């Protein structure tokens, strides 16, 4: 097969830039106005979630002239949920964005935009970022990194052929991902049905200080010579799914980590809107951005605590209680002041059994998803080596 040339993204892009948070310039978000797009406005596959859109004034939009969006602009998340890719459409405009989304504007006639979007979501690009990670807890990508990305660029006819085939498989992957999302939504709906919205105590349950009901502690389990080290990039946003397990020798564990056991719930205080809450299935160590919580066995079920923390109501509330513009973290003083509803343990355990059944269904869907992803990756390998 004829070798396909590789180019840097900067060689084909008219513009690579990013936006700014309006509040840093003295502007506030408002009920309506110009659309302001953030990472949470897009699903994993880049689908636009209109109801998540924030809004800014026309004056603010003009002030943020550098990041005014156009139809066809590619948005690439460079902070938090790294590597989420979306293409700006007419329905999103007028619009602006913040510093967590890189804007990639490609206008050349010899380039097929759907092909570029596919390449940016592929292992070809992910592998380049993985090499830059170098053990940090939370990878952030700079505009320089985006400019330096190398991608294969065949003739336009080949781009169209490749994108057409891969989009079909990508459609299967998206369908499986939506199945998983529906199962997650089912669990959330069941939670609300049984317990009501967290923090509102609609059912009139007894409440308890969250740190009394689930003490925070770095508790060392029975660790082997090779230890599971959990960093935030291994946790899927919104679902808390552990994407992969990184193992290290126990002697390599540094001071900026916390120990946890399989009885804990791990809550990420960094960028709480990403909703990274994990129920670990074995002992290990984690980045200190994770808070290990240990629910009292006779009062609080682990699954109940986990989904209480994952609930939309809690995520919305806690996302406003952060400090730090570039690396927003939950205020731990505020977190410790929270009270959690304490339904009867029997009801919590009924919910946990429901979660367990849904998890079994998710395993089957995930298997089909993994097979489709494997096919996608093998075809990418066939096309580009």
Where are these regions (language model features)?
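Short glycine-enriched, charge-decorated loop/helix-capping segments at active-site entrances
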Residues: 52-55, 167
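Periplasmic-binding protein-like
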Residues: 125-128, 317
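A structural connector/turn signal
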Residues: 63-64, 136, 248, 254-255, ...
